[in-house]
Amino acid sequence: MAASVFCCLRWCRDGGAGHIPLKEMPAVQLDTQRMGTDVVIVKNGRRICGTGGCLANAPLHQNKSYFEFKIQSTGIWGIGVATQKANLNQIPLGRDVHSLVMRNDGALYYNNEEKNRLPANSLPQEGDVVGITYDHVELNVYLNGKNMHCPASGIRGTVYPVVYVDDSAILDCQFSEFYHTPPPGFEKILFEQQIF
């Protein structure tokens, strides 16, 4: 009897038969393989400076995604979503069908068309946090946690968070551990998992 109990305890301690160790999911961050040639990414893939754009390393697969950008230094910048076909050396983004962005002047652009605009008294300033929600149809903007009721749509296909900077702008990205609580139903970007 004692031998069988010992055997059982050893089996549990060693992880049991067929134990598969869990791999830690990679962190969502700015992707140094998908950025403009004059872009600088620092702070473990969380800060962008220089000139040009950069995609995040994870596409928006889930139904309702949320992410944030904090404006550390003003200048020319834009944030939103883009496909892998977006030209990250040609800014501002939003000039073609490969990106939908809010620019630093509060205008939301897609395919070189202004789709919406933030109120003039609600333009993001240095230190502000801009939240983005995306549900595969509509992109919405939040300023310091407040819904700006400024939706834009049109982009199709697999999209990624995108950010571009120029003229001394510095932006920090938050893909988790947000400054503000995501709106109901929206959550951080999840990596797609394949099980087989």
Curated annotation (Swiss-Prot):
InterPro entries named among the record's database cross-references: B30.2/SPRY, B30.2/SPRY_sf, ConA-like_dom_sf, SPRY_dom, SPRYD7
B30.2/SPRY domain sequence ranges: 1-184
PANTHER family (UniProt xref): C13ORF1 PROTEIN-RELATED, SPRY DOMAIN-CONTAINING PROTEIN 7
Name of protein: SPRY domain-containing protein 7
UniProt source species: Gallus gallus
